[in-house]
């Protein structure tokens, strides 16, 4: 039986057809390293009866299931950017109501050629989530509390993505936008891995 990383590579290569084997190895082994997950099985499956099992998706660095995707996304994005956006820094904009923010900050911290900015509603996250985000280490991480709710944060991020003047100014300065929210395919494809792996 293949370990989780082996299953991840086999599944991801079906979707990421423009990634080489070495690139997939780099992404998967970097994302799911033992120092980031509390179980070497990454997403252990425990049988509790003949018909029921429990899949643990909380073994990552922030104890949120979103770590499963947000540990891999920075690697996928970096490899993709090296092919298509040479000499460009990727600015990751994220709207969160809690878990996504911390998991994205943790995933992207200190990743070369990236900057991440997380927007969260000032009264819309728990005190623990706020503390996790506002104390995040990393030389490329920032958080911004907004007045309003999650929908307001998300609308603000979308308006930045669609503002042609902002995009033009960023492009002139060798900057490009991306997202760590679930609109990004790189957030979704890692989820396929743990569903298939559990099966």
Predicted regions and their residues:
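PLP-dependent amino-acid enzyme catalytic core
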Residues: 1-199
């Amino acid at each position: 039986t293949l370990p989780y990383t082996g299953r991840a590579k086999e599944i991801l290569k079906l979707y990421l057809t423009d990634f080489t084997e070495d690139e997939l190895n780099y992404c998967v082994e970097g994302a799911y390293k033992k120092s980031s997950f509390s179980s070497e099985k990454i997403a252990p499956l425990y049988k509790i009866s003949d018909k029921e099992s429990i899949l643990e998706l909380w073994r990552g660095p922030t104890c949120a299931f979103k770590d499963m995707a947000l540990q891999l996304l920075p690697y996928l994005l970096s490899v993709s950017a090296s092919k298509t956006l040479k000499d460009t820094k990727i600015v990751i904009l994220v709207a969160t109501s809690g878990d996504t923010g911390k998991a994205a900050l943790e995933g992207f911290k200190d990743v070369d050629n990236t900057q991440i900015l997380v927007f969260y509603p000032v009264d819309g996250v728990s005190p623990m989530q706020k503390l996790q985000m506002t104390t995040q280490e990393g030389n490329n991480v920032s958080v911004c509390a907004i007045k309003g709710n999650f929908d307001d944060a998300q609308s603000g991020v979308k308006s930045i993505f669609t503002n042609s003047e902002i995009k033009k100014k960023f492009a002139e300065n060798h900057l490009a936008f991306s997202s760590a929210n679930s609109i990004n395919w790189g957030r979704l494809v890692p989820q396929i891995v743990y569903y298939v792996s559990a099966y």
